[in-house]
Amino acid sequence: MGKETTRIRRRERKNIASGIAHVNSSFNNTTITITDAQGNAIAWSSAGTMGFKGSRKSTPYAAQVAAEDVAKKAQEHGMRTLEVEVAGPGSGRESALRALQAAGFTVTSIRDVTTIPHNGCRPRKRRRV
């Protein structure tokens, strides 16, 4: 029984000038992933990981806080320009995009990649409040 050594896993610093920000905003949460051009994840964050729980995860403010966090992580890797792909019907779409622009990124293009079914799966039942 030798002495257990704890190995510190250090994140390697990549120098990537441009990337793609994938903003997925559902009715319950907003996740933001920044990848390089090949799709390898550089940094990610979500409203849930920022400490918001329950119905507060779906607010625009929670999406803004998550976008500021992921922007800080991506700028540590030297990222300057972004293409933004927005998906989903949630309320955090625009606020996450505005937070990425305010963080100092140059946004070259904004694409809406929300999937639209051609009469696929049956939708969930209507809410009666």
From Swiss-Prot:
One of its GO terms (cellular component) is ribosome. The keyword Ribonucleoprotein applies. Coiled coil: none annotated. The keyword Ribonucleoprotein applies. Pfam families: Ribosomal_S11 (PF00411). Keywords: Ribonucleoprotein, Ribosomal protein, RNA-binding, rRNA-binding. GO terms for molecular function: rRNA binding; structural constituent of ribosome. GO terms for biological process: translation. SUPFAM superfamilies: Translational machinery components. HAMAP family: Ribosomal_uS11. Located on the platform of the 30S subunit, it bridges several disparate RNA helices of the 16S rRNA. Forms part of the Shine-Dalgarno cleft in the 70S ribosome. Belongs to the universal ribosomal protein uS11 family. Part of the 30S ribosomal subunit. Interacts with proteins S7 and S18. Binds to IF-3. This is Small ribosomal subunit protein uS11. The lineage of its organism: Bacteria, Pseudomonadati, Pseudomonadota, Alphaproteobacteria, Hyphomicrobiales.
